[in-house]
Amino acid sequence: MDAAHFEKTLTSEVLFEGRVVTLTKDTALLENGKTATREVVHHHGGACIVPYFEDGTLCMVRQFRYAMQQELWELPAGKLEKGEDPFEAAKRELEEECGLTADHYTPLGEFYPTVGYDTEVIYMWAATGLHKTQMHLDADEFLTPDRVPLDKAYEMVMSGEIRD
């Protein structure tokens, strides 16, 4: 499909370069010939996994998220290192955060969580045929995995208890 609308980057200035993100201030040429300033957060992306047990439960994690200043329910996920294969990252997150490995992985696609100003892409897989192993959390990572029935997880999303 050909793009009907476009913006062309004319200039890009790095305002901040961190461990996780880089922030640029860009000048873009709009389709009407005018220019606009765009602030863009550049991110290496993330991998997310949906661990589904045969009994109809999911492994989810509760983790404090500093930016939101609250503990959130989440699916196991993590950021990609530069050049890291998303599938390998998803398998790593399953083991690190839930202490699980899987016999089968099904790709669920990818999505852009914040398209207005962020380049992040999150790649997702479902994991089945789960086996218990050891959790391997990073030194600065504190979370609690828990099994949540799928219908309960749906209710938690609809009630706003799961927001991530």
Predicted regions and their residues:
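A short, amphipathic edge element
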Residues: 2-13
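Acidic, metal-coordinating catalytic segment for phosphate/diphosphate chemistry
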Residues: 11-48, 54
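Short glycine/serine/proline-enriched coil/turn segments at secondary-structure junctions
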Residues: 18, 67, 114-117
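Hydrophobic residues on conserved beta-strands that form the core of alpha/beta folds
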Residues: 23-25, 37, 61, 75, ...
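Unchanged
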Residues: 36, 45-48, 53, 79-164
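Residue-level structural signal for beta-strand termini and adjacent loop
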Residues: 40-41, 64, 113
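A glycine-rich, hydrophobic loop/mini-helix early in the fold
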Residues: 46-70, 74
